[in-house]
Amino acid sequence: MIIDKYKKLLMEHMNNIFHFTKIQSGGYTLYKTNCIIDKSHSMYYNSSDGTFTCPICGFSKDIVSLCSAIRNVDEWVMLEKILKIKLKMDTRPVLVDARKEMFKNELLYQINYDAMLFFEEQLQESPIAIKYLTGRGLTKETIQRFHLGYAPKYNKLHRTLKDNFAEEDLETAGVIGIDKKTGRYYDVFKDRIIFPIIDKNEQILGFGGRTLGSSTKKYINTKTTAIFQKSQCLYALNMVNLSHRPKRILVCEGYMDVIALHQQGIDWAVGTLGTALTQSHYKQLLKFTDNPTIVFDGDDAGINATNRALQKIGKLDVLLLPENKDPDEYIKTYGKQNFLQYIQNNIQTYEEYWLKQYTGKGNIFEYFLNQSKIKKIMY
């Protein structure tokens, strides 16, 4: 991205912006300075990658991303301010590049929006796709609310959109690909149920697709683009009522899990696009709730996934469902009220979860032997 060029430039001038204390850590140099948020001398700067980290506030970002998040402004706006005010630079070239990148992003959003409309129209022409969705218990209203669609088997999207967009731009957006051998363009999503991935500002970032055919890949997503990074996106975040701060947000694995919960009125659920929960996901969630909660099956696979998430993230609440039941299946079988009661009775803090994993299996000695490991994860 163009903005990265200026972020690298800023790294060369950090000493002109902050008063650093130089410290050695593990064979490489770190710098310490006052935290932008809590003002204490607790913020570390890693000059090798330009990252600021504060263990008290829990962030790890470059200076532009950090300041733009604090001030709630666009990164380009914050970059221009830092360069102009702190480094006394002529920022006219920055503004030119900003306009170029913003225009490029707007083009990708428009392509994705038109693709979403196409997929929605194609769903109405596919009895098999409609039968699949209704067979999963989804109502017509839910299908419309989530803008679910269908990608036909052949290259119909390419033929439809190329009249309004350059093929190179369609490929950049990730809705079509190019065959390296023949140079021909093709639809990325074929014979798949389509799940548009929409941000909290109602912009279409990309798509997930679930096969209805014989593809070896059950689910695929849009490739990484300037506006879509799978490890940073949360499915259905736009459907969560963020006007008030939800007490809890449930984080599920699958698209259908999230949709099933919303259909039953559990409208504080999101999904991770089939990937493991990342630090980026976690930081996003903390903007909207104090209690992000991972929801997995109670079988061995679910427990292993929970362990990985806690080892990577740390302070998460945990809800393990009965074995062989995912959220979709559970709420269909037992209903909303039973699900809410199950949450109330079975939610665990990360401390409770780790303690139960050891002591619940009679491994009390292993629990005490692993105290240092657990403390490292939790704190």
In which residue ranges do the predicted regions lie?
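Active-site-proximal helix/loop microenvironment
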Residues: 108, 115, 150-153, 377-378
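Short linear loop/turn motifs
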Residues: 26-33, 79-87, 92-101, 143-156, ...
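Short, well-structured beta-strand/strand-turn elements
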Residues: 22-23, 136-150, 265-275
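Conserved active-site segments centered on acidic
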Residues: 76-128
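N-terminal structured subdomain of primase-like DNA metabolism proteins
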Residues: 1-96, 337, 341, 345
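Phosphate-handling DNA/RNA-contact segment within nucleic-acid enzymes
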Residues: 10, 14, 48, 101-103, ...
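TOPRIM fold recognition
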Residues: 1-8, 55-58, 204-206, 213-226, ...
